[in-house]
């Protein structure tokens, strides 16, 4: 019987879409296809009986109707995506964190309700998924706003969650525009093009400490170039105003406690500090040397910062001077200068590809162990085609990507699935983390897509 149901479900997934595409003139007189509010909704079975998030589930019964807009399915109390229904069978996708396993269906304006007698055995599994974006096999893409199901990107390279609205994620697309992901409405919109802000090459975005303004870094090869612009929330993040000037700046990092801003000059490799209270900037020191592209990422405590330096293939660490309210000179924390690779290891034994954006993520195991520093640092490693992380002790590990080795020996590509066994990225540059929902959002530049990793706990 179980094998029969699985086979039936597989056949249905094909037949359902064909029927939806072709249509049926007799639907109006088909009692199976239309929900009858005077009759009960019933669940007789579902298959498969177990699985993880994204499992395709078929629910069997009666009086479901065929209008998916009127059908709500919950697995383990979590809302599932309903793909289709023919009245006697619902095809849906198991959501993340459906741990409790109950299977429920609600239909119509009358909210007719049914619950399965048995539960779905949910298996926890953290995987890489695609949120939105598209590029075909020939590399053709279309940059456009719209719903997640029909939108496009140039190549997302930097992401930042709005601290006052976690459903809004702002991103730098290519180096030409600022766009926004609206998780609540599942849509993408363009906030501003570089020409509108009088920018040459967008590098990163950030929020001021209170979250009332959005900062934009501009890389322009001119002595009087606007290095950082500020856009107030009160103005809907429009009408950018220059804050500081520098030749070929890439950064606009904010100290999480004191709020001062750090920016740089790629030409000289200099790191600068800007004080909002005085409106003055000061040069701190040179990070490595000239032609040095880098970004500063502060630990949530503000005690130190990591500095990712893609051209040097290293991540440096700089302690914070609380008395003088500025970063101390940095030292190499992991990677070997000039040695590109993807080898995991500690300190200079690790090999990095091109470490770009990173974010600190609390490790609950560290909390249980009572460690002083409970954060790992996750970063997008462009040329390693992977998401990696470094521990407080300097151990570098590959978290996701470089999978599907049975396909070919090339570590890059576009594959969703298991973090290490299946998933592939292509030149990922951007990453941010929603701590509340335990979700990574990744700017997969080479695939022109936004990818996600929902930590299934």
Regions found by a protein language model. Give the residues of each.
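Loop/turn-rich, solvent-exposed surfaces of beta-rich toroidal or solenoidal domains
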Residues: 355-395
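Ser/Thr/Pro-rich low-complexity tracts
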Residues: 24-130, 145, 164, 168-170
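Blade-level signature of beta-propeller repeat domains, shared across WD40, Kelch, NHL, RCC1
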Residues: 425-457
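A short loop-to-beta-strand structural motif that recurs across blades of beta-propeller domains
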Residues: 176-180, 226-230, 269-273, 313-317, ...
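Gly/Pro-rich loop segments of beta-rich domains
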Residues: 59, 123-157, 185-203, 221-222, ...
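Hydrophobic core register within WD40 beta-propeller blades
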Residues: 159-161, 205-207, 252-254, 296, ...
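Sec-dependent bacterial lipoprotein signal peptides
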Residues: 1-23
């Amino acid at each position: 019987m179980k094998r029969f149901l699985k086979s039936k479900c597989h056949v249905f997934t094909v037949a359902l879409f064909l029927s939806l595409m072709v249509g049926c003139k007799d639907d109006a007189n088909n009692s199976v296809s239309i929900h009858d509010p005077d009759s009960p909704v019933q669940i007789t079975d579902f298959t498969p009986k177990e699985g993880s998030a994204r499992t395709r589930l078929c629910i069997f019964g009666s009086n479901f109707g065929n209008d998916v807009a009127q059908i709500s399915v919950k697995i383990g109390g979590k809302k599932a995506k309903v793909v289709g229904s023919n009245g006697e069978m619902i095809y849906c996708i198991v959501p993340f964190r459906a741990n409790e396993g109950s299977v429920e269906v609600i239909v119509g304006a009358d909210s007719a309700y049914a619950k399965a007698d048995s539960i779905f055995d949910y298996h926890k599994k953290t995987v890489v998924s695609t949120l939105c974006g598209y590029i075909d096999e020939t590399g053709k893409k279309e940059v456009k706003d719209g719903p997640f199901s029909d939108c496009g990107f140039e190549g997302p390279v930097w992401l930042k969650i709005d601290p006052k609205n976690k459903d809004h994620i702002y991103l730098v697309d290519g180096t030409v525009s600022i766009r926004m992901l609206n998780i609540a409405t599942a849509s993408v919109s363009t906030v501003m093009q570089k020409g509108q802000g009088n920018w040459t090459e967008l590098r990163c975005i950030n929020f001021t400490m209170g979250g009332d303004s959005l900062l934009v870094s501009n890389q322009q090869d001119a002595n009087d170039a606007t290095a950082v612009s500020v856009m107030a929330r009160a103005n809907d993040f429009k009408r950018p105003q220059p804050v500081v000037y520098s030749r070929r700046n890439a950064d606009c990092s904010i100290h999480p406690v004191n709020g001062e801003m750090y920016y740089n000059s790629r030409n000289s490799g200099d790191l600068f500090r800007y004080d909002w209270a005085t409106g003055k900037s000061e040069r701190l020191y040179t990070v490595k040397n000239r032609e040095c592209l880098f970004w500063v990422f502060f630990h949530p405590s503000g005690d130190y910062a990591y500095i990712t330096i893609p051209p040097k293939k290293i991540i440096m660490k700089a302690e914070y001077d609380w008395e003088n309210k500025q970063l101390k000179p940095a030292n190499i924390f992991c990677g070997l200068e000039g040695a590109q690779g993807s080898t995991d290891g500690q300190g200079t034994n690790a090999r990095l590809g091109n470490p770009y954006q990173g974010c600190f993520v609390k490790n609950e195991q560290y909390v249980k162990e009572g460690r002083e520093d409970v954060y790992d640092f996750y970063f997008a490693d462009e040329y390693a085609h992977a998401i990696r992380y470094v521990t407080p002790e300097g151990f570098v590990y590959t978290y996701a990507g470089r999978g599907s080795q049975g396909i070919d020996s090339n570590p890059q590509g576009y594959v969703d699935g298991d973090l290490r066994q299946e998933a592939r990225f292509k030149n990922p540059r951007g990453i941010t983390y929603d701590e509340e929902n335990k979700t990574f959002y990744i700017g997969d530049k080479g695939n022109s897509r936004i990818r996600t990793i929902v930590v299934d706990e």
